[in-house]
Amino acid sequence: MADYHFGEVENKWQSKWNAEKTFKALENSSKPKYFVLDMFPYPSGSGLHVGHPLGYIASDIMARYKRIKGYNVLHPMGFDSFGLPAEQYAVQTGQHPAITTEQNIARYIEQLNKIGFSFDWDREIRTSDPAYYKWTQWIFIQLFNHWYNKASDKAEPITNLVKQFETAGNAGINAACDEDAVTFTAADWKSYSEKQQSDTLLKYRLTYLSETMVNWCPGLGTVLANEEVKDGLSERGGFPVERKKMKQWSMRITAYADRLLKGLDTIDWPEAMKEMQRYWIGKSLGAMLTFKVVDKDMELTVFTTRIDTTFGVTYVSIAPEHEWIGALTSPEQKAAVEEYVTKAKNRSERDRMSDVKTVSGCFTGSYVTNPFNNEKIPVWIADYVLAGYGTGVVMAVPSSDERDYKFASFYKLPIISVQEGAHTDITKEDFDPKAGTMINSGFLNGLTVKQAIPEAIKFIEEKKIGFAKINFKMRDSIFGRQRYWGEPIPVSYKNDIPYVLNESELPLALPAIDEYKPTETGEPPLARNKAFADKGYELSTMPGWAGSSWYFMRYMDPQNKTAVAAADKINYWGQVDLYMGGAEHATGHLLYSRFWNKFLFDMGITPNDEPFAKLINQGMIQGVSKFAYRINGTNKFVSAGLKKEYDTTPIHVDVSIVHNDVLDTEAFKKWRPDFASAEFILENNTYVCGSEVEKMSKSKFNVVNPDDIVNKYGADTLRMYEMFLGPLEQSKPWNTNGIEGVYKFLNRFWRLFHDTAGNFAVSDAQPTAEELKVLHKTLKRVEEDIERFSFNTPVSTFMICVNELGSLKCNKRTILEPLTIALSPLAPHIAEELWSLLGHTTSVSTATYPAWDEKFLVESNHEYPISINGKMRAKLNLPVDMPAAEVEQQVLANEVVQKWLEGKAPKKIIVIPNKIVNVVM
């Protein structure tokens, strides 16, 4: 067969890989290990579109490449099958999430296998599998049973803390704990009731129960994390979100804030990703300072990084959720305050932090005294102040902070300059808040900012009105969800005291319920299972990020029934060497998994403080939406080039009925009933659609199913084409303009091994120097590009190589066999088939990447461009060692040059060896 029949070949090798477990990873290997992992998908109902496999293809290329480079590769796949996405799909389809999840996973596996990934399916995990979430629950219990000792800078058993309480109280204990934890003696501790002791320990445990301001989404019936809310709406579904106080389980991630920051310096991640985490963690060095409330027995405490600017404080702003709002509000301001607070509660903290344009606030009617100059200043409520950051109170210095300046200007509050010199004018673009020297600042006058800060801290500590402090912007993570489809939290209650289950009681299985939809009241759906609720179990479930915070470790030993994974296997596989996934997980999964890993490191379960050594964020393959333009008030559609002549509305059109921007009008009429009677105003007898690059989405009808591409062109074409679209990290629009080129390349590669009659015909003759040069040049470039994770350039390199070998009519085994190995990571199916035809009985994945030799890359000739009076007129291929005088002779003897010389002698000939020749007339 002269042509390559991809369907037959791909089915053959996919079946063979599966039957023979070709990619099964074993620990008993003398080879160096390489653990390559994709962020596992949540199995949505829509299956994969062509954007999803981008990262999977890249990681699979690296996995296959590392195998042929002599590594023992672990390349697993699983499913993040608990959580909101799976449950929302079930709600929409009216089916139980257990059923839809199973169906969706089967569909995903079918699609993934069609693309030819080298996954070790024996290690597949699912977060909704009780055998898996038993260990998610176990980790929760360990977190509950540990506290963070700042002195040793690690988590320690809570039993150690209890012993200290029993002997000396909590004096001198340096712990990560709630801000409101009170000091007590050993006698106090012993006098506490069991409930009081439990409540006290909750203030220290790494997972704890407390009254917390949360993002409540009635539409989803659950609490959402800050990163799940955008512009006051849930990112999933677009439902309104409000702020309210609820009793919730939380994770004390803030205990690890400093280590999470420091760890970023030890891992090979994109710098932009590290910066996102640094910003989210938000470490700042500053001071705590108290302001006495005028005419009230109250004090407001602020955290500030600029204690040196206190003389410039002209008002204090307080978070809308602050518990003292009521006490601070005067009768005259009550109505205005209540209205403002209600409005502010409808915005998430994330939106309030990022919105720097909107100025809004409300005066409480109260005043405080500035402790540096005894001036009376007003207390305002402002939604840019967050209750969970610092103390929920901010001292405002309009002359030194742009947000304070905008607020003060808008509400006509005083602005006192406390710095002078270059770059100290806040109204100018070159403003630098740390420039100049202090003015209007009493004992700080004349000092630089750097000098003034320690002096100001010394002052507040001597006056006992404050002290130096390190603060973090990151808050503890809400851990409970009022939804059904998640891990049950392994806690039961007795006399209002939470007790974690014994390990022997795990897994606490998710019980079946008839009605699993969320309630708008906040009562968890598990309350509907009377038998479960009557046992006193916690009715909230874990969030979607619980199971994904440690799954990478379970792949090392997925069948283990007695531990997260066996110690020898964890020690063998170690860190994930390459982690592939989207940048959208920066402040969610990628932060939580680092937190849990550090905790498991403290427990001695993993020898690695960081889970992912290298991270690559693949870009997004975007959809190219197509539009038809309907004339308003009619069912008539005008072609894109004529739409300016009419009043139109763009309508998304299914991309499958558009070819090269031309709409199949008959297919359009059949597409939807409301378009059956559509009429068209054409240009040049065709209807031309408009185009726009957007996120690939079913609602935009721009989704391209990879199955369709595989069926038409083959999996190897899809794999190579997705890489060929551009650099892996960049986003790019999907288009099929170049896919035919990749398809034809694979057929040309196939034909190198076959004669014109279609028979396999590979010669054992010795290769020429030119053939060896093509081979070794290709091997070198492909190896170097894959090593630096540049997967688009090897596709071009192979295309050039095949064209050159085709021109040389090369069919020699010495050349084609190494090329087959080198191509196998990108196009494994055709490589396996050709490897087999070459006489090998083992998989090409067991071969060794061929070594390239520099001696074959040495150029013996150079092609000189010949310029006459600055214009290139000819090219001459000459030996690289030819002397300049001989080069001149060859140039003058050239027919093209002679024509341009017109019988005249040149004034000068300039030869730049192995570069260019200039002839000056």
Swiss-Prot record:
<feature type="binding site">
    <location>
        <position position="698"/>
    </location>
    <ligand>
        <name>ATP</name>
    </ligand>
</feature>
<dbReference type="GO" id="GO:0004823">
    <property type="term" value="F:leucine-tRNA ligase activity"/>
</dbReference>
<keyword id="KW-0436">Ligase</keyword>
<dbReference type="InterPro" id="IPR014729">
    <property type="entry name" value="Rossmann-like_a/b/a_fold"/>
</dbReference>
<feature type="short sequence motif" description="'HIGH' region">
    <location>
        <begin position="41"/>
        <end position="52"/>
    </location>
</feature>
<keyword id="KW-0030">Aminoacyl-tRNA synthetase</keyword>
<dbReference type="GO" id="GO:0006429">
    <property type="term" value="P:leucyl-tRNA aminoacylation"/>
</dbReference>
<dbReference type="GO" id="GO:0005829">
    <property type="term" value="C:cytosol"/>
</dbReference>
<dbReference type="InterPro" id="IPR025709">
    <property type="entry name" value="Leu_tRNA-synth_edit"/>
</dbReference>
<dbReference type="InterPro" id="IPR009008">
    <property type="entry name" value="Val/Leu/Ile-tRNA-synth_edit"/>
</dbReference>
<protein>
    <recommendedName>
        <fullName>Leucine--tRNA ligase</fullName>
        <ecNumber>6.1.1.4</ecNumber>
    </recommendedName>
</protein>
<dbReference type="InterPro" id="IPR013155">
    <property type="entry name" value="M/V/L/I-tRNA-synth_anticd-bd"/>
</dbReference>
<keyword id="KW-0963">Cytoplasm</keyword>
<dbReference type="Pfam" id="PF13603">
    <property type="entry name" value="tRNA-synt_1_2"/>
</dbReference>
<feature type="short sequence motif" description="'KMSKS' region">
    <location>
        <begin position="695"/>
        <end position="699"/>
    </location>
</feature>
<dbReference type="GO" id="GO:0002161">
    <property type="term" value="F:aminoacyl-tRNA deacylase activity"/>
</dbReference>
<dbReference type="InterPro" id="IPR009080">
    <property type="entry name" value="tRNAsynth_Ia_anticodon-bd"/>
</dbReference>
<keyword id="KW-0067">ATP-binding</keyword>
<dbReference type="Pfam" id="PF08264">
    <property type="entry name" value="Anticodon_1"/>
</dbReference>
<keyword id="KW-0648">Protein biosynthesis</keyword>
<dbReference type="Pfam" id="PF00133">
    <property type="entry name" value="tRNA-synt_1"/>
</dbReference>
<dbReference type="GO" id="GO:0005524">
    <property type="term" value="F:ATP binding"/>
</dbReference>
<keyword id="KW-0547">Nucleotide-binding</keyword>
<dbReference type="InterPro" id="IPR002302">
    <property type="entry name" value="Leu-tRNA-ligase"/>
</dbReference>
<dbReference type="InterPro" id="IPR002300">
    <property type="entry name" value="aa-tRNA-synth_Ia"/>
</dbReference>
<comment type="similarity">
    <text>Belongs to the class-I aminoacyl-tRNA synthetase family.</text>
</comment>
